Amino acid sequence: MLNIFSLICICLNSALYSSNFFFAKLPEAYAFLNPIVDVMPVIPLFFFLLAFVWQAAVSFR
């Protein structure tokens, strides 16, 4: 469990502190998609949390 947590922390740190992550801009033709693109990195975390909710629903069998 500790290894998985460490891997998640490393992935989040590399995503948050990479210089291209915050300063990359979409081409002007796709500017209307900016709000969607801002939310997209969070979507995998929802699946991660869903796994815990699912296991809680089946009593962690």
From Swiss-Prot:
PSII is composed of 1 copy each of membrane proteins PsbA, PsbB, PsbC, PsbD, PsbE, PsbF, PsbH, PsbI, PsbJ, PsbK, PsbL, PsbM, PsbT, PsbX, PsbY, PsbZ, Psb30/Ycf12, at least 3 peripheral proteins of the oxygen-evolving complex and a large number of cofactors. It forms dimeric complexes. Keywords: Chloroplast, Membrane, Photosynthesis, Photosystem II, Plastid, Reaction center, Thylakoid, Transmembrane, Transmembrane helix. InterPro entries: PSII_PsbK, PSII_PsbK_sf. GO terms for cellular component: chloroplast thylakoid membrane; photosystem II reaction center. This is Photosystem II reaction center protein K. The lineage of its organism: Eukaryota, Viridiplantae, Streptophyta, Embryophyta, Tracheophyta. Belongs to the PsbK family. It is a single-pass membrane protein. It comes from Vitis vinifera (Grape). It is found in: Plastid, Chloroplast thylakoid membrane. Residues 1-24 form a propeptide. GO terms for biological process: photosynthesis. PANTHER family: PHOTOSYSTEM II REACTION CENTER PROTEIN K, PTHR35325. One of the components of the core complex of photosystem II (PSII). PSII is a light-driven water:plastoquinone oxidoreductase that uses light energy to abstract electrons from H(2)O, generating O(2) and a proton gradient subsequently used for ATP formation. It consists of a core antenna complex that captures photons, and an electron transfer chain that converts photonic excitation into a charge separation. The chain crosses the membrane at residues 40-60.
